[in-house]
Amino acid sequence: MNLKQKYLTDVVPALMKQYGYKSIMQVPRLEKIVLNMTAGKEVTNSKAIEEVLNELTQISGQKPFQTRAKKSNASWKLREGMAMGGKVTLRRDRMWDFLEKFINVAMPRIRDFRGANPKAFDGRGNYSFGVKEEIIFPEIEFDKIRRIKGLDVQIITSVNNDKEARSLLELIGMPFSKGEK
């Protein structure tokens, strides 16, 4: 059973019972997942930008769009409008496929992983997770990358509070670290 089926058959009824929703349309749902990666120190190198875009394509299965600098920064040798990295927004089936791969394959491969930080919610029901090494994804071949880069993952939900969003992600299978709720 894939993650979308699990959501429809197990998670929706559990959340309806837990929070007393009258309609299925009130139940929290995932709206989108946004992946963001930058070239970091190699922002002036066009090959590094291409590498970022290729890796995001491999990870997400969708072509990313190039992100550009909003402001110039002399210490980073960055000029306004200069390419910095890439960004992908996943919705519907690609979102569910990515989340399943992220939870079941990539997260267990994170070095010293003890669970996702339960405090990383933004106060509006959205969850952000930073990955330090993109090589945790099986699509990325370690031999073909020049430099290890990080990746930002934002999970956007339909609810406006963190408690319900956390319940949704826990029931889907997100491994949160033990400790504060």
Curated annotation (Swiss-Prot):
It holds the Pfam family Ribosomal_L5_C. Signal peptide: none annotated. Keywords: Ribonucleoprotein, Ribosomal protein, RNA-binding, rRNA-binding, tRNA-binding. Disulfide bonds: none annotated. InterPro entries: Ribosomal_uL5, Ribosomal_uL5_bac-type, Ribosomal_uL5_C, Ribosomal_uL5_dom_sf, Ribosomal_uL5_N. SUPFAM superfamilies: RL5-like (SSF55282). GO terms for cellular component: ribonucleoprotein complex; ribosome. GO terms for biological process: translation. One of its GO terms (molecular function) is rRNA binding. This is one of the proteins that bind and probably mediate the attachment of the 5S RNA into the large ribosomal subunit, where it forms part of the central protuberance. In the 70S ribosome it contacts protein S13 of the 30S subunit (bridge B1b), connecting the 2 subunits; this bridge is implicated in subunit movement. Contacts the P site tRNA; the 5S rRNA and some of its associated proteins might help stabilize positioning of ribosome-bound tRNAs. Part of the 50S ribosomal subunit; part of the 5S rRNA/L5/L18/L25 subcomplex. Contacts the 5S rRNA and the P site tRNA. Forms a bridge to the 30S subunit in the 70S ribosome. Belongs to the universal ribosomal protein uL5 family. This is Large ribosomal subunit protein uL5. The lineage of its organism: Bacteria, Bacillati, Mycoplasmatota, Mycoplasmoidales, Metamycoplasmataceae.
